[in-house]
Amino acid sequence: MFRAALNLFRLWGVSDVQAAKLLDLNGRTYARWKTGDLGRIGRDGKARLSNLIGIHKALRILFRDPGRGYLWIKAPNDAFDGESALAVMLGGDLTDLMRVRRYLDAERGGW
C-alpha cells in the first residue's frame, strides 16, 4: 500500500515534505521508507494509507479524466472554505484526511 501511496503522491504533485506530513512521518523516516526500508507500519499509518487510497479511488470514480482528479486535490474548494483538499489534509491529523474522504464519498454517493 505504501508503494501505491508513493505513486499517488507523484500523480498529485506532492512534495516529499508534504508526503511525510500526510503520513505523519519525519523526513528522515519518509526518505528511508522511500528506499524500501519500511519498518513497521502502525495502526495510524495504515489508516492514513487507507484514507489516501480511498480518496484516490473516489476521485477516479468522480472524474472520468484522471488528470482532473489530480488537479482537484490542489484546487480551492468551497466545501473546505476555499482551501484545497491538499491544504486540509496537510493539517496533519488523521481526521483531516478522513474529512476529505468523507466529502468525496458523499459526492459519489458512497455513503
Where are these regions (language model features)?
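Non-transmembrane "mature" sequence context
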Residues: 1-111
